[in-house]
Amino acid sequence: MKYSIVIPTYNHCDDLLKPCVDAILKYTNMSEVELVISANGCVDNTREYLDSLKQSFDSLGFADHLKTIWNDAALGYSRATNEGIKVATGEYIILLNNDAFLLPQERHRWIRQLAGPFETNPRCGITCLIKGPSAPAGHDFAVFFLVMIHRRVFDKIGLLNEDYGVGGGEDTEFCIEAERAGFEVCECVPKMWSTDGNLFTGDFPIYHKGEGTVHDPNLVPDWGDIFFINSVKLARKYNRAWFEEKTKDLPVNHQRLKSLDPGIYNEIFQINTYGVERAEIQDRIVIDIGANIGMFSLLCHEYDAKTVYAIEAQPFIFRRYLKDNVLPYEDIIPLNYAVHRDFGQTVRIPNQGGLSKIGNQGDIVETITLEKLLVDNRIQNNNLVLKLDCEGSEFDILLFTRSDVIKRFDIIYMELHGNTNENPVLQDPNLIRFYLQD
């Protein structure tokens, strides 16, 4: 297959996905193209539509030209897109937002225009409609609502960075890394910007609604916060001056949020419930499971930890508090997982009462094991520090983690709660003590 069109989609089946796909089928020579739709977190009629679309492709004789991917959890733009790229077979990968609609044109014109720069420029790796500046990155980038990327770019620099969550910034980073690897990012048509610099016109037959998913408050309630946090991530990597300017007035004392939760502040910073000493933390990697709003992680920052991985299961607390609280500090990495005995599952986390244990109602969150957490983050050190405060899941995490993995931690801080495991054998704290000493 020469071209693969990858479309990530999150709900909005009738108003976005359907018209997007209808236009592709109408104005594209499908004999040269495969369509890959990566559905994630959809609770509308997307599944039924994809089933009917498969039947349509079968009837047209293009059964092998449609691939669909389904994930119950909302993965975010980068991850959902990467899932599509992984199964795509084309030499050229077209990334297309579901809120972009082809306009009337000669069949296949849009493909030819995107492919044009590849034919005249051997260094071209990415073609796009819009290339503009990113202030946080201090670099130009292609806006990924529609781009064509040669497979050799992915082969050399990898897929989109999934650290940007919902989205915003992954396209900038990908373009920067592609250029550093020797590729060029090329606009496929000339454009003319409006006087205010917000709109442009050009000779390309497409209409882009513009962030139709992330601007839906029912799907992404805090897009402004997410975009700012992702901008800081970019600046940390590529434009230190922007990062330092934006975060210069955010010292740790301000970030402790005493008025938000004075109990947690006092517990960690003044009472020092865990009995933490600087010498135990300094220059070590800390795994903070049950980070809540980030107070323990910030204490570790003050004690000069090398890196702190702040893991919080509750999506609301993670988005609204933890990420913002640790934002200015490069040594604190916030992660939204439910650490458990298994990984790769999706569980529901209750957003109430400050609890972070796995429950039967609430937001869907992906599970991860302690071992996989270390592997995924390339943590190879053996003098690690572990902190556990996860409302009863501490027992499951420790008892179902291999002993050789546990022994990589020199120090374990743990707040014990009632064990949620129904097996009475696993409810005895002495069993934990025996296990750790084994």
Descriptions of predicted regions:
Residues E32-C42, K67-N71:
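Short beta-strand/loop segment that forms part of the nucleotide-sugar
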Residues W70-A88, D140-F141:
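Glycine-rich, basic loop-to-helix element that forms the pyrophosphate-binding segment
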Residues F101-H139:
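Conserved donor NDP-sugar-binding/catalytic core segment of glycosyltransferases
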Residues W242-D438:
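Phosphate/nucleotide-binding beta-alpha loop and adjacent structural elements of enzyme active sites
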Residues I93:
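Short aromatic/hydrophobic "clamp" motif used to bind/position activated sugar donors
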Residues A39-Y49, R341:
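A conserved acidic beta->alpha catalytic loop
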